[in-house]
């Protein structure tokens, strides 16, 4: 006989666990896949592993509702921003943080090139709440001035790589525990990243 309580509990745990959505690169275009998972607070954690048979031109609007952390673990890429005379690039071993600007971005993935990116998008209201909960006003002003008005780069550290390696373990937890573990790793990565940005670019009181 099936225990209905345990059956329902198991179903609830599964349905309330973080769900990873994976999209494969079309076979006629190349190899690889893009996967993402969303935390309870709306942060989006995604992996981009791609190798296209030929140059792939992509364009899209950078959403103003998020601040993004982009990590490049293999071949780099550059992109242009509409209405701006600037070209942004990121190379292997680099990462950058910036707020979406609501403008069109244009980039080209070179063919027969191995791309591996990890991306974390944090909703702006959530990001502001984190700053207000944990930092003094002077620190908040310094971070916002630097992070919300341009693009800051820092090198990927071994500890950042360690956090990403652990982040995948959220699948070992069911229900709310999975979300809690995932959120904790996003927090940990953000704290390490802000520390790197502050020591590299900011002079905080």
Give the ranges of each region predicted by the language model:
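Short Lys/Arg-enriched alpha/beta "domain-start" segment
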Residues: 1-15
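Generic surface-pattern signal
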Residues: 11, 15, 132, 136, ...
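Intrinsically disordered, low-complexity, positively charged segments
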Residues: 18-20
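An amphipathic alpha-helical interaction segment
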Residues: 120-129, 148, 155-199
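Short, cationic low-complexity segments
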Residues: 96, 140-153
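Alpha-helix initiation and N-capping motif
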Residues: 3-6, 124, 136-137, 160
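Conserved small/polar residues in nucleotide/adenosyl-binding loops
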Residues: 200-205
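N-terminal regulatory/effector-sensing and dimerization cores
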Residues: 22-139
């Amino acid at each position: 006989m099936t225990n209905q309580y345990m059956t329902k509990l198991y179903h609830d745990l599964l349905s309330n666990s973080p769900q990873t959505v994976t999209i494969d690169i079309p076979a006629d275009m190349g190899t690889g896949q893009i996967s993402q998972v969303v935390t309870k607070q709306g942060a989006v954690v995604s992996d981009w592993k791609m190798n296209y048979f030929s140059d792939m031109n992509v364009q899209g609007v950078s959403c103003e509702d998020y601040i993004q952390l982009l990590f490049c673990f293999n071949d780099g890429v550059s992109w242009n921003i509409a209405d701006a005379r600037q070209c942004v690039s990121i190379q292997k071993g680099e990462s950058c943080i910036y707020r979406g600007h609501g403008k069109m971005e244009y980039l080209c993935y070179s063919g027969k090139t191995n791309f591996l990116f990890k991306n974390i998008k944090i909703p702006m209201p959530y990001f502001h709440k984190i700053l207000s909960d944990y930092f003094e006003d002077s620190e908040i002003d310094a971070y916002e001035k630097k992070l919300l008005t341009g693009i800051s780069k820092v090198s990927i550290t071994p500890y950042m790589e360690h956090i990403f390696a652990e982040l995948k373990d959220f699948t070992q937890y069911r229900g709310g525990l999975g979300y809690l573990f995932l959120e904790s790793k996003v927090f940990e990565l953000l704290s390490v990243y802000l520390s790197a940005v502050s020591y590299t670019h900011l002079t905080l009181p």
